[in-house]
Regions:
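Cytochrome P450 catalytic core segment centered on helix I
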Residues: 149
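N-terminal start-of-chain detector that recognizes signal peptides
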Residues: 1, 19-27, 66, 93, ...
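Extracytoplasmic/secreted proteins, especially bacterial periplasmic and envelope-associated proteins
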Residues: 10, 60, 64, 68, ...
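Tryptophan-centric aromatic hotspots in well-structured domains and transmembrane helices
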Residues: 11-12, 54, 93-94, 146
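A generic local structural motif
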Residues: 12-15, 125
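Short, small-residue-biased leader/transition segments that mark boundaries at the very start
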Residues: 2-7
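Extracellular/periplasmic periplasmic-binding protein-like sensory domains
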Residues: 15-88, 142, 152-153
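Segments of small-molecule ligand-sensing domains
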Residues: 71-84, 95-146
Length: 154
């Protein structure tokens, strides 16, 4: 992910130096708080993204997740972002699948998957067939953080 982040932060800084951030809105997908930090607060004006998770997401579960993360890893730990949180969500999903199936066997999990739902930092995640249905949020960059402005619904 470093080359992608590096390309994004270089682009954001060049965009701001050219003055385009004052008149052109950008929608960049699959960026996280790490890109904002690498870009610098002066290069994030007019930047939006859509994602399933933001560190600033105002859900009760996310506030607890962030608090536990800070307690465990300290203030010098990397910012929580969509990539790291997705790894955590994967473990939550596996736990919910195994609990519903009452087994770790693939066949049992496969049979149980359509009855699985859980609450995670991003909100409620529900299995529908072989896919998850989960919230996606629109956020605007506010210097080095994202401000979640809407939940996008299908």
């Amino acid at each position: 992910s470093f080359p992608t982040r590096r390309s994004s932060d270089l682009f954001n800084r060049a965009f701001a130096r050219a003055g385009l951030d004052q008149s052109v809105v950008r929608l960049s997908l699959m960026i996280g708080e790490d890109v904002l930090c690498a870009s610098g607060s002066g290069a994030t004006t007019g930047l939006y993204t859509a994602c399933g998770y933001f560190e600033s997401l105002p859900t009760e579960v996310n506030m607890g997740f962030g608090s536990h993360y800070l307690q465990r890893f300290g203030s010098a730990a990397p910012a929580l972002n969509n990539i790291g949180e997705s790894c955590y969500e994967g473990l939550l999903l596996l736990t919910a699948l195994a609990q519903t199936a009452r087994s770790l066997e693939v066949a049992a999990i496969d049979r149980a998957r359509s009855n699985v739902a859980y609450q995670g930092p991003r909100g409620e995640v529900v299995m529908r067939g072989a896919h998850t249905r989960q919230p996606v949020y629109l956020a605007s960059a506010d210097q080095l953080e994202f401000d979640v402005i809407a939940e996008l619904t299908p």
